[in-house]
Amino acid sequence: MRRGLMGWNAEELPVATLEARLTRLRAAMAKASMDAFVIYTNNTRPSAVHYVTGFTPYWSDALMLVPKAGAPVFATALSKRVSEWIRTTDPLSEIVNTPKPGALMGERLTKDNSVKRVGVLEYDTLPSGLADDMAAAAPAVEWTDGTAMFTGLRREVDQSERGLLARADAMAAAALGEAEAGKASDAGTLAGLIEQHARLAGAEETYIAIAHDLAADRRLNRTSQPTPLQDRFAVRASVAYKGCWIRRTRTFAKDAGAAKADSWFDGVARSLEPGKPIAAQLAAKLKELPGAALTSWIAESCTGSYPLSAVASSRAPGKDAPVNGQFLVLTVELTLDGAPWLGAAPLIVGQGAL
């Protein structure tokens, strides 16, 4: 269950922005010959519903129905006592409390005789109980996967989303500064200090992972144990603000190599170009960092119901040309003069850092 404050701020996320997103979604639906669109959500898959409505699901299963016209319908198994709170964070939808969201979705669809074909985001991962209930209540409907359509819609961010991402990034960057303050000598204490800093700044959720001895093990782990920090360690902060997630990773070391790699990586994040393979861009940029060898990289973005998912990586060459205006979190692992270094930062392709 989420622990941070969740609320809707009309200045940060105006109703006009949500209405514009809904209009774009309906235009994409029409182009794909979909008469309605269904999105499944829970506490680990909140992002698609948040993008359309502003509401961040925090527990339980729920379904959202986007019809061709009229208000979206958000059907949740949560009790009625939270309905009013949901309404304060979702200014567009009709909120319905029901123990069987799938059956309700199907019943709503059958009331409109023009509905023949319905898209479902990430159809293959829709829980079978909900899928069965929808199909039983609307046996004449043709169900189809709408993931590609929605992914195309999410390739560019609007100004409101960019502002929320920038706010989350500022929280993460400032919180990681706790590692420079010398307040902690062990991983558990440092993780607590970083999380505390981010939450007091307004973070909705945080996940802190640490590689306490980067020279021995590059894996980043969530920990509360008093494991001593070594001369070279790395910290990753995944932070959410108003439903928008970012990641930052930094390497901390007593030598000057980490700072040189940080400066290089900042330039990479600010200069990533659209239409060109990320692998080729990194290879070219690596020439500007003498003594460096690239180990791996991954680019993540929010394209569906999950906050961040891999969209390109060093494991899948040839499919990594980003789109102008696309939000990415770029993570790079390299060695500099034989010493390991990890870094991650958010960016907008073709427009630089957030």
Q: What are the roles of these predicted feature ranges?
A:
Residues 1-354:
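Active-site neighborhoods and metal-handling regions in enzymes and metal-associated proteins
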